[in-house]
A protein has these predicted regions:
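Conserved N-terminal phosphate-binding loop of PLP-dependent enzymes in the Aspartate aminotransferase
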Residues: 1-429
């Protein structure tokens, strides 16, 4: 094998060609992938517990997705929907309108990234309400664009050095029993926000991840989501549910919002929507979504025909392969193994998450007030050395999140958990 094909050589070329601001988890370079496995340019195999940050619920290179993309490529790759539209965009919109929770008629807008979806959700909320304020949550993540960063409740690395950010964005604490933040605490903070920062009649929307992603996989309870829905209705505020990471069966429901039995006014979607192709969506109540004037929404690549074809195939796979049920089974498998590890390792402070959106919080001596970010970083590195791709998250940088493809076999998941145990032993020294 020539030197140019080695990970080390590619790393040197990366450092010479790519900006420093794009971080990299592992210094390996992938040549091919299949379902829940990766192989780098040196032929080393990895079990993928990251799924490209929750993008591959249907796995790498699912045959049905590949076939759909190939068929569309043979027809055409791009026209721009705003110039000469095409059926795939409409067919996918119809399916999402039917899938998103609630009886109210829906409309869908397609874009390319999750951050774009969030930006446009805020635009639509402002257009519908005539208001400008937005309330978000500490620990929330909504993208790296300027409004996305303003809404995001985590500074390092996303917001460092990039301000000032758009105004009239206010943050509430996110409820977490583990961190000692009660739902009553959050509701009291909202009351204080209304009295000290912005009156409710100026708030266009409250945006929430039903399960925080980058923030640490903290789930909002059904009772809290219901109360938030009631408060939004009381004050004429739109409720935006950001399901970019939690959507498309990751939690054991098609959307995590379903656990609360509520209907959001707007939902943002991306990541696993299109099986690895860049596609995002804003889906919401028709009367809300139609507030923007023609020409105010869209984008050159928004709703790419290739990505729409992939997404239509993804929706078929979800149904045919029963991914909600498989997410529940995978989550139970992972949590059972983590509970066994927690009996042996006092660094495991909490195990949580619905379905296969599972997190393990690392602390010192089971003390929630003593997060262990250093151990978390070492664990990710040791896992990578052993052929397991793991992601960390959390405002305190001490949470391991599990995002294996939902199509991964139980045997492969077990193999990955064996590697996790080995890595944890090594990381602890």
């Amino acid at each position: 094998m020539s030197q140019s094909a080695s990970n080390k050589a590619w790393q040197a070329r990366r450092e010479a060609a790519v900006v420093n601001g794009v971080g990299t988890l592992l210094p390996v370079f992938i040549e091919r992938a299949q379902n829940a496995e990766l192989w780098d340019v040196e032929g080393n195999r990895y079990i993928d517990f990251a799924s490209g940050i929750a993008v591959l619920n249907t796995g790498h290179n699912h045959p049905k997705v590949v076939a759909a993309v190939r068929a569309q490529l043979e027809k055409f790759s791009h026209t721009c929907f705003q110039v000469t539209p095409y059926p795939g965009y409409i067919e996918l919109a119809e399916k999402l309108n039917a899938l998103v929770p609630g009886p109210t008629p829906k409309r869908t807008l397609f874009l390319s990234t999750g951050a774009e979806a969030v930006e446009n959700a805020i635009k639509i909320a402002r257009a519908h309400t005539g208001r400008s304020g937005t309330i978000a949550f500490k620990g929330g993540f909504h993208g790296r664009t300027m409004m996305g960063m303003a809404l995001t409740g985590k500074v390092v690395p996303y917001k460092t050095g990039f301000g000032p950010f758009p105004g009239e964005v206010y943050h509430l604490p996110f409820p977490s029993d583990y961190l000692g933040v009660s739902e009553a605490d959050v509701l009291a903070a909202l009351d204080l926000c209304f009295s000290s920062d912005i009156e409710p009649t100026r708030v266009a929307a409250i945006i929430i991840e039903p399960v925080q992603g980058e923030g640490g996989f903290y789930p909002a309870s059904a009772s809290f989501m219901l109360r938030l829905r009631q408060l939004c209705d009381q004050h004429g505020i739109l409720l935006i549910c950001d399901e970019i990471q939690s959507g498309f069966c990751r939690t054991g429901k098609t959307f995590a919002t379903e656990y609360a039995g509520i209907e959001p006014d707007i939902m943002t979607l991306a990541k696993s929507l299109a099986g690895g192709f860049p596609l995002s969506a804003v889906v919401g109540k028709a009367e809300v979504m139609n507030a923007a004037k023609p020409g105010g929404l869209g984008g050159t690549y928004a709703g790419s025909p290739i990505a729409c074809a992939a997404a239509l195939a993804v929706l078929e796979v979800i149904e045919e392969e029963q991914l909600n049920q498989r997410a529940q089974a995978q989550g139970e498998q992972i949590k059972a193994r983590l509970q066994q590890l927690a009996e042996r390792f006092d660094c495991i402070g909490d195990i949580r998450g619905p379905g296969a959106m599972v997190a393990m919080e690392l602390v010192k001596q089971r003390d929630a007030a003593r997060p262990d970010a250093d151990l978390t970083k070492r664990l990710v590195a040791e896992a990578g050395k052993r052929g397991l791709v793991l992601l960390a998250c959390g405002v305190r940088a001490n949470v391991i999140r599990f995002l294996a493809p939902l199509t991964a076999s139980p045997a492969l998941v077990d193999e990955g958990l064996d590697l996790l145990e080995q890595a944890l032993l090594a990381a602890q020294g």
